[in-house]
Amino acid sequence: MMRKLAILSVSSFLFVEALFQEYQCYGSSSNTRVLNELNYDNAGTNLYNELEMNYYGKQENWYSLKKNSRSLGENDDGDNDNGNNNNGNNNNGDNGREGKDEDKRDGNNEDNEKLRKPKHKKLKQPGDGNPDPNANPNVDPNANPNVDPNANPNANPNANPNANPNANPNANPNANPNANPNANPNANPNANPNANPNANPNANPNANPNVDPNANPNANPNANPNANPNANPNANPNANPNANPNANPNANPNANPNANPNANPNANPNANPNANPNANPNANPNANPNANPNANPNANPNANPNANPNANPNANPNKNNQGNGQGHNMPNDPNRNVDENANANNAVKNNNNEEPSDKHIEQYLKKIQNSLSTEWSPCSVTCGNGIQVRIKPGSADKPKDQLDYENDIEKKICKMEKCSSVFNVVNSSIGLIMVLSFLFLN
């Protein structure tokens, strides 16, 4: 099957190629026949001549070239004809062909004459003997023959006939045309030639004739026109040139001239205006900010300065009022010493629960300064008495590095009950045992 298809395709290809070659040959022979008819037929020759005439008629330059070549050819033919006639060597066949050529040339010449453009005469300029018909008939016979050819044609007809014969020939060509007609004829001949061109035209006619010749030439052009006419003539020559331009105009005229130059710039602006003017200058700067505001105003001013600072805070407040009390509170109670010893031991035990010192508070504030907020901080200790701090709500917008220890920070005491180290060890052990047992059981 494949062999049959191959044979069929090859045979089809050969058949188509044979037809194509035959078509090519037929086309070539047909074109050759048409060209032969155009070249050798009389009608084709006439058509060629007409095309040639039309072509050269449109192209004038080529037409002239063709005409010249034909003229040369005609002259050559005439010379040859004369020579042949004189020699008697021309035959009838040649004469007949030459007669036909002459007819063709005559016909071509007539056509060429029709296509030739007529020549136009050029305009000629009038000679010296023909005067200008538009010339001025009233020319001045005495006119200056040396008139400036570049003179102004629009000269002023109203020029001054009595011009100054001694006028400055080098006058300023840029002079002011609107000069003052009432100018001073007796002007100062020694006037300053470099006067200020921008001088004030409305100068003060009553100006001071005794002006200081050493006045400052660089005076402030923006000086205050409303300056105080009653200014102090004896002003301080050493006044501060950097004085505050926004100084308080309502300042106290009776201010203390000996005020403290090192006063606290961060002083409380809301200080008590009714404060005691005779306050103790040596008061404790670290006083307890949480002191009882309702302290007894009748307290003993001569209290014992050596009192026990570690007294039992849980002591019975009514013990001294039970002069004839019952039980262990009786004045002659034999167990009284036992109770006092127990109280002393309790006082020793409570040493771990005493309130934190100011130093401890300051250290804690430095430690948590970046985390300070209006919320209470964690307790400063994990066992015993500590402190909690926060920023007062009114000072929440202040930068943390500008917070005042006394006025911007609020403090309170906190207590941590679980202080036994044994308890911590037991808790840790129980937790470890629970973790290990959980791991092993699983």
UniProtKB/Swiss-Prot annotation:
Which Gene Ontology cellular component terms are annotated?
cell surface; cytoplasm; plasma membrane; side of membrane
Q: Where is the composition biased (Polar residues)?
A: 319-334
Task: Tell me which SMART domains the record gives.
Answer: TSP1
Localization, UniProt? Cell membrane; Cytoplasm
* Positions annotated as sequence repeat: 134-137, 138-141, 142-145, 146-149, 150-153, 154-157, 158-161, 162-165, 166-169, 170-173, 174-177, 178-181, 182-185, 186-189, 190-193, 194-197, 198-201, 202-205, 206-209, 210-213, 214-217, 218-221, 222-225, 226-229, 230-233, 234-237, 238-241, 242-245, 246-249, 250-253, 254-257, 258-261, 262-265, 266-269, 270-273, 274-277, 278-281, 282-285, 286-289, 290-293, 294-297, 298-301, 302-305, 306-309, 310-313, 314-317
Record's keyword annotation contains Cell membrane: yes
All disulfide bonds of the chain are 379-414, 383-419
Using the UniProt annotation, give all residue ranges assigned to the region (Disordered).
Answer: 69-357
- Give the record's membrane topology: Lipid-anchor; GPI-anchor
Which residues does UniProt assign to the signal peptide? 1-18
Location of the TSP type-1 domain: 367-420
What's the protein called, per UniProt? Circumsporozoite protein
List the lineage, top down.
Answer: Eukaryota, Sar, Alveolata, Apicomplexa, Aconoidasida
Primary gene name = CSP
